[in-house]
Amino acid sequence: LKAGTPISYRAGDQPNNALSLNVFNPGEIASTAGTSGVVYGVLDQLDYDKLSRVNTFAHVNHTEEQMRLGVLLCINGTGILNSWLKHNFATSLSSYGDMNELASLSPIGSKGLSIIPFGNGAERVLENKDTRCSIHGINFNIHSNGDVLRAAQEAIVFSYEYGMNIMRDMGMDINVIRAGNANMFLSSIFRQSLASVSNATIELYDTDGAVGAARAAGMGIGFYEDSKEAFSSLEKIAVIEPELEKREQYLEAYERWQDHLKEII
């Protein structure tokens, strides 16, 4: 850098991702679903999970005068499960799009099939237990590839909901979840299942962390008057609402999944 170049912004990857989605204030939620998955929300009161299943730390706009704390839920076994299935189970399919299409043939709940997706090491949300990945309820007479693929996506969604309940217990309202249009959020099954299980609206945006950091740096040097101006051009490209008429089916599948998890932990 040339001498005199202003350094006006710094942040970790998940606070920066939240910023890129214009998540600054209490009740606003950001999410990612790559190799691992994250749900990140903002609180305006000092709180923490006594079992340390989620992390609490200062958000990018926290000040002594205005408390803004980020609460981070991380699920290690997210997209890596989908990737493992692609390379070891669905080898005849050429893309994740093909996997999603096959999974869409299976009904909500995957005909009673449940997957515990924690095969990427110990999970903080489980108090650092390493449960490994497991499949429950498989029936050789009724289940097929599509059921397994759908159950995997539902398993990740259910893991998010399990963790978001911890965040709710800390006083966080989860009504809208913002995410970039990437990774597992490209799957309509994943998006719709997450919206319906959590009873939250999902908003997808055309952005990424690099763009968010550039906007933040602009705010830091005064190029933008405030965050409202900085994010005025942020493009919302899709909105996914919960399927209220089918929510009972999603919740029944979640409860079955949670019962299997309780048996393990």
Language-model features, listed with the residues they occupy:
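Active-site core segments that coordinate phosphate-bearing ligands/cofactors
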Residues: 1-178, 183-265
